[in-house]
């Protein structure tokens, strides 16, 4: 596990993730606290698919792939899954810290509903749940495409195309509540509307399929 952390969480990657969150919290303006999730989801998705694209391809770049192939498939997959988990936990921590940075730097107006002060806490936990799915989906998808083409830049580019389509007014009109970014396009005025969860279910289902397909891709392309 320690070795996987050193490989997948290098200092440069940690540094640019933290810097990204810091800059975002300074330049992305929000007026109310319930807008923070919208301000963070799409940019954090970009961070996720750039951060995780080299989860496996770094073995190819560093020319360790020949040694890697000597390991059993089970061991190789466990290693990849651990690296993905480590990166996703780090990104989720960055997402949580980013939420706090918006309060620190921009001091948005707290959007209080009938639940009083507890509504802000509930809103944060809902945000974290949505971000866990978003980060997981884009990180897994980026790694899958990178493994398929043995190139991290193809993984990043493929995800960027999908990101551009779904994170748009056109994407919202076409997919509605089933959009990958349904959390960002949700109705802020209706806190009881959880139809955006459909989009997150889509992310989870695609993520599971991607993880299931990964061993076959590694076996053929690894």
Locate each region found by the language model:
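Aromatic- and glycine-rich beta-strand/loop motifs that create alpha-glucan
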Residues: 1-15
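Short loop-to-helix capping motifs
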Residues: 8-12, 74, 150-152
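Secretory targeting signals
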Residues: 21-54, 81-152, 187-190, 198, ...
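Terminal transmembrane helical anchor/hairpin motif
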Residues: 30-32, 122, 147-222
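Small-residue-rich segments of transmembrane alpha-helices in multi-pass membrane proteins
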Residues: 49, 78, 162-163
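Helix-loop-helix units of permease transmembrane domains in multi-pass membrane transporters
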Residues: 53-89
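Membrane-interfacial segments
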Residues: 60, 64, 101, 105-113, ...
């Amino acid at each position: 596990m320690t070795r996987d952390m050193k490989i997948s969480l290098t200092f440069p990657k940690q540094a640019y993730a933290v810097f990204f969150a810091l800059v975002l919290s300074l330049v992305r303006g929000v007026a109310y606290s319930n807008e923070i999730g919208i301000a963070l989801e799409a940019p954090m998705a970009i961070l996720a698919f750039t951060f995780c694209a080299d989860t496996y391809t770094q073995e190819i770049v560093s020319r360790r792939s020949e040694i890697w192939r000597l390991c059993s498939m089970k061991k190789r997959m466990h290693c990849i899954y651990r690296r993905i988990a480590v990166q996703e936990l780090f990104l989720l921590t960055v997402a949580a810290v980013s939420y706090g940075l918006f309060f620190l730097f921009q001091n948005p107006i707290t959007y209080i509903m009938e639940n009083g002060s507890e509504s802000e806490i509930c809103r944060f936990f809902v945000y974290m749940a949505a971000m866990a799915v978003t980060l997981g989906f884009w990180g897994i998808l980026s790694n899958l495409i990178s493994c398929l083409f043995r190139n991290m830049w193809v993984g990043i580019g493929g995800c960027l195309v999908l990101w551009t389509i779904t994170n748009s007014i056109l994407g919202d009109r076409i997919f509605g509540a089933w959009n990958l970014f349904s959390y960002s396009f949700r109705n802020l005025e209706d806190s009881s509307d959880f139809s955006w969860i459909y989009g997150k279910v889509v992310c989870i289902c695609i993520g599971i399929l991607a993880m299931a397909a990964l061993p076959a891709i590694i076996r053929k392309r690894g």
